[in-house]
Regions:
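A cross-kingdom feature that marks ATP-driven nucleic-acid transaction machinery
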Residues: 1-131
Length: 131
């Protein structure tokens, strides 16, 4: 029971990420249909031309190959939407393969962010996508 309690939020966070990827895959998100959503991480050159490890909880290419959805999943409260979005865009713009796409940053959040950038999807939105 203690082990479950100690790792419960970590477990829920992992399931939330998977649910968000499943919700994006093959579905219409803000008017665009995306292919298979995956987790992506790797080393890129940052603004100072130094190697930097970046990670995306959700990444999916639109079926017409014009848009690249990059997403951050947070199962916590009190997130700063504008700050998270700025960081998502910063990281996405470091990706060499992202140059040919319009980047679509999406925050998948448990609760509405305290500083909303207008790109948050809450749990009810994710569930709605899966219907």
């Amino acid at each position: 029971e203690q082990a479950l309690t100690a790792h419960f939020s970590e477990y829920v966070s992992m399931q939330w990420e998977k649910l968000c990827r499943d919700a994006v895959t093959g579905n219409l998100v803000n008017g665009v249909v995306y292919g298979k959503a995956k987790r992506w991480w790797g080393s890129v050159l940052n603004e100072d031309k130094k190697p930097e490890q970046v990670e995306f909880d959700v990444m999916a290419e639109s079926l017409e190959k014009k848009y690249l959805l990059v997403g951050e999943c947070k199962w916590t409260t009190g997130e700063n939407g504008k700050q998270l979005t700025a960081e998502l865009l910063r990281k996405a713009n470091l990706l060499p393969f992202a140059k040919n796409y319009t980047i679509v940053p999406v925050l998948f959040l448990k609760n509405a962010p305290k500083d909303d950038a207008g790109n948050a999807m809450l749990s009810e939105n994710v569930v709605e996508l899966m219907k």
